[in-house]
Amino acid sequence: MRKNTVRGDALILTVSDQIEQLEYILENLPDICFHIAAPVHFSEKIGVLESKYNVRLVTVTTDQQIDFLVNMCDFLLDINHFQEVDAIVSRFVQAEKPVFAFDNTVHGNQGQEVFLSSTPDKLVFR
């Protein structure tokens, strides 16, 4: 399978380690730097991802830190299960930056581009 050559920075803001199709996305978007951010400690499942060259783990505890990530990142991946964290989807929408989600992780109808979780390649090659 061909690799996508898109470059840039993506944000995933979560409070859980249940992130849909994460391994597939990391493998197939090697030129994207993924900032996985959380206001909590990372589980071992997520912690081991820091060894990947295109993953940055960030603990966020203030609105200023989140605003910095919104400004820095090119798009948001709304692919975390459970609740939306700190209204991150609306922050990206207000910043006029794209938000991509899966059908089983989308947080409300806030203008996200939604893909079937069973076909992650559609998101990757978007």
Q: What are the residue ranges of the model-derived segments?
A:
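Short glycine-rich donor-binding/catalytic loop of glycosyltransferases
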Residues: H81, K97-G108
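Short acidic alpha-helix that forms the nucleotide-activated donor recognition element
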Residues: T62-D74, Q94
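Short alpha-helical segment that forms part of, or immediately flanks, the ligand-binding pocket
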Residues: D67, D86-Q94, G108
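Nucleotide-activated donor-binding/catalytic signature segment of Leloir-type glycosyltransferases, i.e.
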Residues: E44-T61
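Short acidic active-site motifs
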Residues: Q21, K45, Q64-I66, A87, ...
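Acidic donor-binding loop of glycosyltransferase active sites
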Residues: N71-E84, K97
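Conserved catalytic-core segment of nucleotide-activated headgroup transferases in glycan assembly
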Residues: M1-V48
